[in-house]
């Protein structure tokens, strides 16, 4: 068989009641207990059947032998696209099998072809005079409409990425001109023409105003950590976009500030001053590279343009201690900052954690998981939002440990642990499994779990509650406890993203992407099916559930104070509870 062949599972082809739909020759019903293959060569003339295993006896029910799911197993990119176009219906709603195949293809096509390749292939299918030399003239507009339907679905899925791709913009203009030329010969294309006029209109508005800064799936935040090469972003950064800015207070601790890219130093300093409870006029910001060079930021300096280096950090320092590299020591005064949390309502605090996590989770494009999995670098220009949610999970874990270990008084520390157990329970109740896992892992951090004096004073009912919460994080049986509990939760809900990525990675590493020079589309279907978990979780929207009077609480959650050094955390742990 040639390299252009396509291999598919088609359980419907062998049903007795659909025999008339087959070719002229009768094919016997195979007695297979697993789905079987149909090979389609380039001319689509010969059929060859095979199976991975055979059953010794034939089941009485055809339905019990054959899956209802229609699955493309493998093929060249061109043949997969051709098969997809053949199967598309022009009705408003596709059948389930075709809809799944279309969604699988659109979610994963970048694995085996570039966007430019896809655009060129679609143009060829649209402009072909005759399809494989056997198309009736009456079928031409139908084929064109199928191509346009696929394009519209592609645009709907990638509406926030396509305007940044030059190949896509050129393709949309070209196919629009083709439809404009064809509509006189085929008036039935008028509906598609109007749709493309709307699409091109939206793209023009995107060029002018980048849509709304609040639009879904746009990169709402960008990592701004000098420790990790500062800024990671997708496409051109605009002044309306926001960043995660780490402002270091000591060598191992920082305040995480959410601010616009266009923010000046004075605006960021105001947030930091409020967080660390110092007078703004007594503080200043300085950019310090790892080579030791310092650059003091003036009030009106743009933070990014003035301090964007390959490596380094932004520090806040007291003006009266300008010559000190780390002007804020972890002294008794800094330790007392942890006491603020004891006065906060645990449900409201969990609610703010959920709001923040949802803003990140709701901004993740489904294909970010594909890029993250297939890119050896892990995070890049197409995974900004996903990387930020993963970073947030890590920060919440560090925040829990930081708050507990900065509390030197045993009684207060016991209250803090109880507080975090309650917050974790509320996160579970609010269906925010990302922060739930992070808090439980923070309480189980070695530097916290070793605090025997603290844990001994935790009341029995809290220990029991924490044990129940811990059981959901049990990794045994492939995280069965978590999966069962999460499956029962109704959307909207936030999954534990590292585990979802683990699932996609497991499929990727356990299956070859190409088999005999053909795209292993069965693997891509499994990946797409897992990625669709995001879509299910976002079936409904949380919205902003924060009362206006929670602004202080919201500011606290948005700008967490964390110590990011495990060594520093262990030193604090041994300081408050020395080894006996």
From Swiss-Prot:
SMART domains: RasGEF (SM00147), RasGEFN (SM00229). Residues 345-579 form the Ras-GEF domain. Widely expressed with highest levels in brain. Keywords: Guanine-nucleotide releasing factor, Nucleus. Its main location: nucleus. SUPFAM superfamilies: Ras GEF, Ubiquitin-like. It is found in: Nucleus. GO terms for biological process: nervous system development; Ras protein signal transduction; small GTPase-mediated signal transduction. Gene3D superfamilies: Phosphatidylinositol 3-kinase Catalytic Subunit, Chain A, domain 1 (3.10.20.90), Ras guanine-nucleotide exchange factors catalytic domain (1.10.840.10), Son of sevenless (SoS) protein Chain: S domain 1 (1.20.870.10). Residues 68-201 form the N-terminal Ras-GEF domain. Disulfide bonds: none annotated. The keyword Nucleus applies. Pfam families: RasGEF, RasGEF_N. GO terms for cellular component: nuclear body; nucleoplasm; nucleus; plasma membrane. GO terms for molecular function: GTP-dependent protein binding; guanyl-nucleotide exchange factor activity. InterPro entries: Ras-like_GEF (IPR008937), Ras-like_Gua-exchang_fac_N (IPR000651), Ras_G-nucl-exch_fac_CS (IPR019804), Ras_GEF_dom_sf (IPR023578), RASGEF_cat_dom (IPR001895), RASGEF_cat_dom_sf (IPR036964), Ubiquitin-like_domsf (IPR029071). Guanine nucleotide exchange factor (GEF) for RAP1A, RAP2A and MRAS/M-Ras-GTP. Its association with MRAS inhibits Rap1 activation. This is Rap guanine nucleotide exchange factor 5. The lineage of its organism: Eukaryota, Metazoa, Chordata, Craniata, Vertebrata.
